[in-house]
From Swiss-Prot:
Its cofactor is Mg(2+). PANTHER family: 2-PHOSPHOSULFOLACTATE PHOSPHATASE-RELATED. The gene is comB. The keyword Glycoprotein does not apply. Its EC number is 3.1.3.71. This is Probable 2-phosphosulfolactate phosphatase. InterPro entries: ComB-like, ComB-like_sf. Pfam families: 2-ph_phosp. It is an enzyme of class 3 (hydrolase). It catalyses: (2R)-O-phospho-3-sulfolactate + H2O = (2R)-3-sulfolactate + phosphate. Keywords: Hydrolase, Magnesium. Belongs to the ComB family.
Amino acid sequence: MRLRVDLLPHGNYPDVVLVVDVLRATTTAVTYLERGADALLLTATPEVALGLRGAAGEGGVLLGGERGGLPIPGFDFGNSPVEAAAQNFTGRVVVMNTTNGTGAAHIAAQTGKHVLLAALTNAHAAARRARALASEEIAIVCAGTDARVGLEDVYAAGVLAEYLLALGEFRIDDGARIALTIRRNAGDPLEALSSSGHGQHLVGLGLGDDVRYAAQVSTSTVVPVLDATQTTPEVLRFVGG
């Protein structure tokens, strides 16, 4: 079994893919499902998200997303896991579009057999689910920030890799070795996330609570899983697994 870590999304994923955007899209996605959402729809663009609202009518779906860390005009929510954790989404469908994470999920879905969303908050559950599904390879895909490698995602990939290596034997690539090295040398999760460039950006926007929330490890058993039967090139449907 191969274990691969892509420090940025590259594509060509033949088996299981764990998409990581710890600050903040995949952390927020896990929280939406924890708080009762029936499904998450990750769109290719904000315009597609707004179109889904128009098609569904008032109250049909809720929109969450950001650009540059700030809420998208016309959306109901930003991309804040703290904000999401304070809501009740029971029975609702949440449509998401973000700067980095939703795009990484779309790249993964082009070829991946099983696509999961992973964060620190669900790291143990995501690793177990990935191992159970995999037949030849698990790829951990870091979303990065504006096409640049993000310390926070590589750190989270290292946490996931540690869990996976505890579950069985893998042939690891250089990306996995880099992620494991970062995990072992970047301090505790909050220190790693807070010292990252994107973490500092969010703190500067007054979103330090989101960074602290995202630094929690294995507090959730929810793993968003792509429902390939109800997915299109512009809209990916994830449900809790």
